[in-house]
Amino acid sequence: MKKHIGISLFFMGCFLSLSATNYFVATNGDDSNAGTLDKPFATLQKAQSKVVPGDTVYIRGGEYRIREEQMMGGDHLRAYVFEMNKSGTQAKRICYTGYQDERPIFNLAEVKPEGKRVSVFYVSGSYLHFRNFEIIKTQVTIREHTQSECIYNQGGNHNIYENLAMHDGMAIGFYLVRGSNNLVLNCDAYNNYDPVSENGTGGNVDGFGGHPASASYTGNVFKGCRAWYNSDDGFDLIKAQAAYTIEDCWAFYNGYKPGGFVGAGDGTGFKAGGYGMRSKVKMPNEIPHHVVKNCLAYKNKNKGFYANHHLGGI
């Protein structure tokens, strides 16, 4: 059922290289090891501490049950599980990928920092490539209005997120506020519902959120992605200050609690913009014109395609 969109990524892909270092992480590894195929690290945190531009981290298959003491950073609002703050270069990306046809899964069920939003992959680095793994059971602990994110691109540019699945948790699948020229390719977000905050309304759990906070954050793309059974919207561009492109994507069964048709949040398939209806909302100097093309919406709770009063239309 997966719809793969072809794109020429060979020159920026992850592959075994003779001119850079390849590190390995495995469920039976040890962070005192050398990080080789035969003696892998145990954690992605250890591998990330070693990489330089051009390196690749291969993550062996299996389930990685993440613990709170493994968190790499945070601020007054968020806890960062994996703080991806190292950058590659245009010629030498840093890659984090499932090994060959193996499918690693990061399980966040035990990460419940009190009073904090959870950002599983907090990405401020640039020229990174994340590929072929899953993030499950991301938690929410705050009772008031809040959110958690499986992937939060906060300042990273020229990143690729490919063939990832963010599912069966309480968090937004992918969320961008700062950064330019980021490609989210062939990724899935599904079965995500927050029963904890705001009495379980589920109104802040989108599949994919593109919300660039500056007109300079251009060139961001969702391509070949699917969103279903997210308790709010499938794809949401509300308050975006720069144009976003959504291409060849699917949105279905959003706005419901997973597994049935019990209503939860807004339930729009593709919510392409808008700045709210309050009289004091600050508009950007130039309203961005989002592009949504070759996309499919089916049986979302509210609308399939909705400009959300966006002055630039779609």
Which residue ranges define each predicted feature?
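Bacterial Sec-dependent N-terminal signal peptides
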Residues: 1-21
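Extracellular beta-strand-rich solenoid/capping regions of secreted or surface-exposed proteins
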Residues: 45, 49-53, 66-95, 105-131, ...
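Parallel beta-helix/beta-solenoid
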Residues: 52, 86, 91, 101, ...
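Extracellular beta-strand/beta-solenoid scaffold signature
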Residues: 72-84, 111-121, 143-152, 168-176, ...
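Loop/turn elements at helix/coil->beta-strand transitions in domains of secreted/extracellular proteins
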Residues: 21-22, 53-56, 92-93, 101, ...
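Right-handed parallel beta-helix/beta-solenoid
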Residues: 18-46, 63-65, 100
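Feature marks extracellular polysaccharide-active and adherence modules
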Residues: 60, 97-99, 107, 123-124, ...
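Acidic, glycine-rich loop-and-beta core segments that form the ion-binding/anion-interacting portion
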Residues: 243-254, 258-269
